[in-house]
Amino acid sequence: MLGTRASKLTMVDKVPPSFSSMERMRHISLFILLGAGGSLLLLTGCTTGRVASGAPYHVTAYRPHDPSAVRVKVSLSKENIYVMEGDRSLMAVACSVGIPDKPTPKGNFKIYAKEEQKRSGSYGFSVQGNRIVPSTGGGPGRYVGYPMGYWCEFAPAYGFHQGFVHPYPRTHGCIRLHGEAAPKFYALVKIGTPVNIANSQPEDETLGPKVQRVDDSKTPDPPASLMVTSGAFQKPSGPLLE
């Protein structure tokens, strides 16, 4: 069974039914530092070092000349996302992908659903006065779904979304983007944007070495009291696209 801080899961990564209440809360309580005050900054395209939690990390995303020409490529082996317009790189960032037992699906897909402030209908929180406890719906209290910010669905129950990025596969099949990158990815793609997911991509050789890594594995858990508010969906400051 997963335990402790090193085994955190986030966003739409499914909560196994065997999780204890405390483990489920740990699973649920990981989003806010990436979406609210204290979100990290992402820098791509100029350095290859690893950035630890709390270090500056800033993503530059470029506005496409032709939005209909935007393509998304995911390299599972490198855990990189390349947003391309022809040969032009619009954004190249690190991500977290599925663990071996729950892999991210490979193949050609299209973005077919987007929701900036999506919440889960199957797990989240029960708000009971001043008490907030993990919940899968039903029971006492007011149910508030787990925040799945900047959700871009490419296959049933699989999507790109905001969450902690680890330097190793960590999700239950979805693709997590850092809190500074997820809103920019959301702005770049539209319904119908093609997505290719493969073990490797040609861009691994050209763009991959320039993608700065990030390690959120030791980022502290945010409070559940913020998870149930709109503060879970705050945008980064400044323009999303250059």
Q: Which ranges hold each PLM region?
A:
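Bacterial N-terminal signal peptides that target proteins for export
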Residues: 20-33
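Exported/periplasmic cell-wall-interacting domains
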Residues: 46, 51, 119, 125-242
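Cell wall/extracellular polymer interaction/catalysis modules
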Residues: 46-120, 124, 137-141, 149
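Bacterial N-terminal signal peptides
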Residues: 32-42
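Low-complexity, intrinsically disordered Ser/Thr/Pro- and acidic-rich segments
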Residues: 2-4
